[in-house]
């Protein structure tokens, strides 16, 4: 259990200006320990949440419902939907319009043949905006249509303080989430066996 708590703490520290967290067996609402605000834990992030992985018990929280820009943590939802779309190992050619991106990329080029699984690696490891966009266009036909799917899935998970606009997380008007919702999302993603 201590190892899981340390893993969760590392994820929070790594991902947070907006925040992140762990998994559990279901995406039920999180339960809070008493006095989480008096834990004595010092965190420099504006928003943070630490959850025990198996139970979903909130061990620490700070401004966990405050809306924040969520940047590349958006790609957790994009990867989840990519894997849930099925056929993770089926090959396809990337749409050339999807791979012209700002910021980080996995290095996709016009004519590249990829799988959805490879795109998940590309969006989660080097934080490839091209991978996120290529997946979105492959699944939904456009980034905006994919954002509709992202918001529908967020609602199913119980993410009530989240709105997705882009699959990559590049700042866009109206795109935000909170530490609490990102914890729900991460718990859901960790349950995906692919």
Model-found features: residue ranges?
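Sec-dependent N-terminal signal peptides of Gram-positive bacterial secreted proteins and lipoproteins
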Residues: 2-24
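Active-site-adjacent loops and short helices of periplasmic peptidoglycan-processing enzymes
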Residues: 24-180, 187-193
């Amino acid at each position: 259990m201590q190892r899981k708590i340390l893993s969760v703490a590392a994820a929070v520290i790594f991902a947070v200006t907006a925040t992140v967290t762990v998994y559990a067996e279901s995406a039920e609402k999180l339960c809070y320990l008493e006095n989480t605000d008096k834990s004595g834990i010092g965190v420099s992030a504006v928003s943070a949440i630490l959850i025990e992985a198996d139970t979903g018990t909130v061990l620490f929280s700070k401004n966990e419902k405050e809306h924040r820009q969520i940047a590349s943590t958006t790609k957790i939802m994009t990867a989840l939907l990519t894997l849930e779309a099925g056929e993770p190992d089926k090959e396809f050619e990337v749409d050339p319009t999807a791979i012209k991106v700002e910021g980080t990329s996995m290095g996709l080029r016009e004519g590249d043949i990829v799988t959805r699984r490879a795109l998940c690696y590309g969006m989660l490891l080097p934080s490839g905006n091209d991978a996120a966009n290529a997946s979105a266009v492959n699944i939904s036909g456009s980034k905006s249509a994919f954002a509709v799917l992202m918001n529908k899935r967020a609602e199913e998970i119980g993410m009530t303080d989240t709105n997705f606009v882009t699959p990559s997380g590049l700042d866009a008007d109206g795109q935000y989430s909170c530490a609490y919702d990102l914890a729900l999302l991460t718990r859901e993603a960790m349950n995906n066996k692919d």
